């Protein structure tokens, strides 16, 4: 039930954020927004899993999301590492780790795992990032 709710919420958020971006963008080639921190809302995950998720047609993303929930190992210092899968982020605070890609951005954000909530390095769509405090 939790996965169904999270998956449905992710789909609604993804659709809503796409519409909002389309309404606010003036078209043309806008310069890439640079920021060091902010918030992220949408689907994100381990690099390989997130690439697989984005490569799927929209109709197959729901099933992929449900079948590939994020899982990570936890270090002695309390950090998530060696992650696989994807997760839904709801206005999570983040710090930019790598913004060299045009469509995605690698961030450090807290993710909810079976063991609790831990900081992890994940990839999200650039359009899902809101810069600022």
For every predicted segment, state its role.
Residues 1-8:
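Bacterial N-terminal signal peptides that target proteins for export
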Residues 6, 73-78, 91, 113:
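Generic preference for well-ordered secondary structure
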Residues 11-12:
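Repetitive helical segments and hydrophobic/amphipathic motifs
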Residues 15-19:
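N-terminal signal peptide c-region/cleavage motif recognized by signal peptidases
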Residues 22-82:
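N-terminal secretory signal peptides
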Residues 24-33, 83-129:
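SH3/SH3-like beta-barrel superfamily modules
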């Amino acid at each position: 039930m939790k996965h169904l709710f999270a998956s449905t919420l992710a789909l609604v958020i993804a659709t809503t954020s796409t519409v909002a971006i389309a309404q606010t963008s003036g078209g043309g080639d806008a310069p890439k927004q640079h920021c060091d921190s902010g918030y992220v809302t949408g689907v994100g995950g381990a690099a390989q899993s997130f690439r697989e998720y984005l490569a799927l047609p929209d109709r197959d993303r729901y099933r992929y999301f449900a079948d590939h929930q994020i899982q990570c190992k936890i270090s002695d210092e309390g950090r998530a590492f060696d992650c696989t899968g994807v997760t839904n982020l709801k206005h999570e605070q983040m710090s930019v780790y790598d913004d060299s890609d045009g469509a995605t951005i690698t961030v450090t954000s807290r993710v909810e795992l079976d063991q609790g909530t831990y900081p992890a390095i994940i990839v999200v769509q650039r359009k899902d990032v809101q810069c600022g405090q």
